[in-house]
Amino acid sequence: MRTRFLFLTSGCKAVPELHKIVLANAAPVKNPEIRYASTENRNYYITTPIFYVNASPHLGHLYSAVIADCFHRHKQLQGFNSRFATGTDEHGLKIQQAAEAAGKEPLEFCTTVSERFRHLFSSCNISNTDYIRTTEQRHHRAVQHFWSVLCSKGLIYKGSYEGWYSTQDESFLTPSQVTTALDSTGKEIKVSLESGHKVEWMKEENYMFRLSGFRSQLLDWLRENPRAIQPERFHHSVLQWLQEELPDLSVSRQKSRLQWGIPVPEDDGQTIYVWLDALVNYLTVVGYPNNHERWWNVAHHIIGKDILKFHAIYWPSFLLGAGLPLPQTIHVHSHWTVAGKKMSKSLGNVIDPQERSQLFTTDGLRYFLLRQGVPDTDCDYRDDKVVKLLNAELADALGGLLNRCTATALNPAQVYASFCPDSFPRERGGRADDDDYRMLESVRHLPAVVEQHFEDMHVYKALEAVSTCVRQTNGFVQRHAPWKLDRKDSADQRWLGTIIHVSLECLRIYGTLLQPVVPEISNKLLSRLGVQPHERSWTNLNFLPRFEGKDCPFEGRALGSDSGVLFSRLESQRADQQKNRKMEKGSNLK
């Protein structure tokens, strides 16, 4: 018979499977009503996970932040009042031990690493509206209030815990989640099946949360809300986990083991479990326990797949217990690997996001992560992939199109050229061909396509759709070769203006839609077109009004003065190395 977690009321002897008997005698958990978030207002609240400060930020941390930032900017583009929180998780045994190893006080250690995250996000144009640290007093107050609410509802009781615990993961594990492995000396040790981190057998008296009473409510929530957890495969994973009974959860540690954390109210001998502490940050940011409803009703979480259980089982259960609405969506993303392997210090394959953002530009790295990152599956990172993608799509396709249509050779007047309905009539005819009409249809529907992909958390598909339209527009210009037209011929002159006008309209749509992804490049593109800041919202995505017989506010307007390159081509690492070797040889000859 398999031994389970032991969750026993104070004074009971630890016996396998006895927790069922104990719970039968304990006060029953009332089934709280599931409260769903409002979808009626124009507020939007998105969060990243708060990042653990045991080490410096890596590419995966930036990926989470870029995704959240992209959704935040997208909602702002659509006129939503958006709030975006990120920050650092600074309590727990792992931090306590890391600070001791570094010879620093825990708060000093946390502040140093937290500032690295803050600096990275600032330098990569992460536009968070709040940066939360779990060592702040506002969070301390929120966590203790949340704990007290759960206690008042009879959901926390004091008992004994005996089982496996991973300090690295700050996680309790069942026997089925543990396996045997060999350490570096060949000694047998127990490790987590999921993370591979070492686990230890722990036995202590602490506080338990009645997680076992929430399984049916969680199942109801997920079945009634099939888009609550996205992508779909992760929704199914959680449903699969819920096919088994949920054991109660230890939510505190003895202070003798863990000093670095928030004390349990009215029991200074216990410290609140780091995951309960950390998850409450999402409430702290919006003012919990006072005036939080306005924002908490529209909450969305961005998380990595490794912390799905904490966010999809523990967190909703805590919220249900506290009588609070559940988040509207939990967006889950997979991980970045290098040569198919997980990044780790021991393998020496950790990608420094700060270094790469300087190498490929901030917008370049953001574009690559969102264009290549697929939420459902792990993605492999290589520098040459970054160079190839950015050169093809940002430098050549988008940058080349802008350069062609705004160059003095084709547009000597430097204006938003005029559209001629006779050259490109609504009914097929004039000098436009079938491919041109198909291109117009693609660009006209592009905002709706992009919006749907954002709703599905498929930003990479939205960018693929934009890239396809950019290629179509380049094909349109290439087919009609406006540089070959005779400007002395009035018909050719009108057709030239029409080609440029249509191309600039396409670029305006692309620049507007790309603002959440590459804000600096989009700003440069739209400024070059003469599009003012107040003309860059979702409501301005009325494509080619002259084609519909309406006025175009941009027609005849002077273009912006910045005629610089939109995105400079990147040289491959191999080319850079060859260039450096030549320079070194040259300097040696002198």
Swiss-Prot record:
It catalyses: tRNA(Met) + L-methionine + ATP = L-methionyl-tRNA(Met) + AMP + diphosphate. GO terms for cellular component: mitochondrial matrix. GO terms for biological process: methionyl-tRNA aminoacylation. The keyword Iron does not apply. This is Methionine--tRNA ligase, mitochondrial. Its EC number is 6.1.1.10. InterPro entries: Anticodon_Met, Met-tRNA_synth, Met-tRNA_synth_2, Methionyl/Leucyl_tRNA_Synth, MetRS_core, Rossmann-like_a/b/a_fold, tRNAsynth_Ia_anticodon-bd. GO terms for molecular function: ATP binding; methionine-tRNA ligase activity. It is found in: Mitochondrion matrix. NCBIfam families: metG. PANTHER family: METHIONINE--TRNA LIGASE, MITOCHONDRIAL, METHIONYL-TRNA SYNTHETASE. The keyword Mitochondrion applies. The gene is mars2. Belongs to the class-I aminoacyl-tRNA synthetase family. Residues 570-590 are annotated as: Disordered. It comes from Takifugu rubripes (Japanese pufferfish). Disulfide bonds: none annotated.
